[in-house]
């Protein structure tokens, strides 16, 4: 398994949460007279860390030589995450598992999506409110996502508009040796859209990474017959 944990955007998410925790600890310490000086220091440190995380500039990346369907579909992006896993199964079995895996098989999926939308996504079926027993890709394509490439048993690419002028694309790529990768890319068109999505991404990035890795593990269990 592998994830780009050292990517700047993941680091900024950690910085954001550390700043929020330091600020909260500082406010709590300020309630006690003997701890007020320490509380002020923690609060100032926390605010500084949050401001650094929020204001850090976003760098755009571009594909030079398209090597995959994903490269051709989204050659420019500012936000990304990538995960991979090794599966002891044929590409056909892996691809079938990708299409059939359900939200109920993905550990922490329901908990993290509920936290992500603060309980406000429970009225209609969507990727953030997916039934346990329905294939998660069927839920996605029925609620705003479109299949952009379906090259069985190696490439599946789908995407959606996540906000005005902001587009997300995600893929699953199966190698002949059983290596499965998934990559998410987001392109925000314009400075205002980029700033808005940057804050959102830095907040949800840790939970998103957990979901993506758990999703791959669920595919692995299904493909290897270990559900």
Segments the model singles out, each with a brief description of its role:
Residues 15, 19, 25, 196-227:
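A conserved amphipathic terminal alpha-helix motif
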Residues 41-42, 53-137, 142-144:
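Hydrophobic ligand-binding cavity/cleft-lining segments
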Residues 63, 164-209, 219:
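Beta-strand/loop substructures that line and gate deep hydrophobic ligand-binding cavities in soluble
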